[in-house]
Amino acid sequence: MSSLNCDPSWPLGDGCSCWRCNRLEQQDRVTADSLQAYRDWCPGVGIDEKHHQLQGIKWCLYHELVEKPNAGVRGGIIADEMGLGKTILMIACIRHNFKARTLIVLPPALLQQWVGVFQRFLGHTPFVYRGSKAKNVTIEKLAQLPVVITTYGMISPRRTDDDKLAYSKLHKIEWSRIIYDEAHHLRNLKTKVHDGACMLKADIRWMVTGTPINNKLKDLYALCKVLGLAKVFTPNKEEIKLLLGIHLLRRTKDQVGINLPPVKTQVVEVDWSSDAERDMAEDIHSMLHFTTINKNNVDEIIAWLNRHPLAALTRARQMCIYPQLLHKAVKKMKRKGIIPQDMNIKDIKTSSKITSVVDHIVGNRQTGKRKLVFSHYRGEIDVLTEKLRNAGMTVQSIDGRTKTRNKKQRILSVVSEPQFHSVCKTWNDLPEGIFGVINSFLAPEVMIVQIQTACEGLNMQHFQEIYFTSPHWNPAVEDQAVARAHRIGQEKSVDVYRFVMNGLGRNSISFEQYCSHVQDIKREVMQILNNK
């Protein structure tokens, strides 16, 4: 990136009038005016002015206004840790550097959240390009709208009857600015949604995600390709660090001086408690071969995992969590010789994992902390719910069966946020933080969540104990899950319990132990985001 000072060979002095200095001074004035406008705006909408947000807005405005952007790219990657206000940065850019046409692309779970943010902070209801609205609106009308919100599914091209790709009305418009929220949804280069994102035309592009790397460096390359940085992206890690130093903004809570209660993590190693359970686990694991993984072969291992029969991996995980999940698959496994013909799943009376999770939750009841349990399967959620309720605890759950509009209500158990606001004349009638206080009284003792359904769009800072029943392949998913509770507003320390089944004998590791090792290597790869 070029220096912000004029050419050292130019005779500097009072009243320097070179074109470059004049441009920079003009840009600085515009940025300063926008920052002051932001400061004046904050009190009226109930935003506390924070230094890290001012610095973030200044960074964003520079990358929108810079006369000659690096590699010709305006915008960048906003990768601040969850809870630092990435959405507010984008709202500030929209308000204080107004553009004629801004498109926001996001997961469906965040649609109403973003609409609410616009209504609250800007007094504007954006057009939602989805469903019948998308079908009926004309391209001319779309081009006249200042803000359009849509989902990743809507930018994905459709295959026509003659096997050609048809792009949406959104692709026929020259957008001033595009914001991709939860941009890690674009990490797969081979998907139609990534192709659709690359084909959208815009002067400014923002990728907003706390996890720009989920599995491997190619995730980051995929985002850079949408930004327009593919030609300057190299495999050299030192050059990648230089590139990120220009185009990526990443801060942690610690770095910006936000002091939250600590997160304490405990790995709970679980032994196989019965011979029947161990015997079946050994048979199922015998079908898998776990290759040693390190930073040099992590990309190849991830590719292998993607090619490996999903059923075998799924069965190994289900066996570790709750063997009864395999009930329908037993006949097929017997037919293929994976397990003996005389093996009966009914002989497995209990699940070592379920027993351990329930015992820990019930045993920790006296802490007074509410428990957030992240699970993988509906059957697992159902049995945990039954056992915890039998122990006298109040339990709610969220899984793929839960409609988006019901998720917040289940977290609160008694009343939803819209219902609460309906008794107030306006949003501003609510004392700051009052809803969080009410949450702390209404939330259930235990909330069980299917991990892939609740890592976006939900704040759960009224829970202080987190349980992962089984490790996820992607550590970023677990980090996001923890961040739902460990965020601004959390007043107690957060205890995290990670349950892992032990190995099955000498030099034999369980599926979950291998999964945990894969996580460790992926975390090492992610350190490039922190310039390490």
Features from the language model and the residues they span:
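Conserved Helicase C-terminal RecA-like lobe
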Residues: 71-75, 81, 89, 94-98, ...
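Conserved helicase ATPase motor motifs in RecA-like P-loop NTPase domains
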Residues: 82, 203-216
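Inter-lobe coupling linker of SF2 helicases/translocases
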Residues: 149-150, 154-155, 168-171, 192-202, ...
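A conserved SF2-helicase RecA2
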Residues: 473-482, 486-532
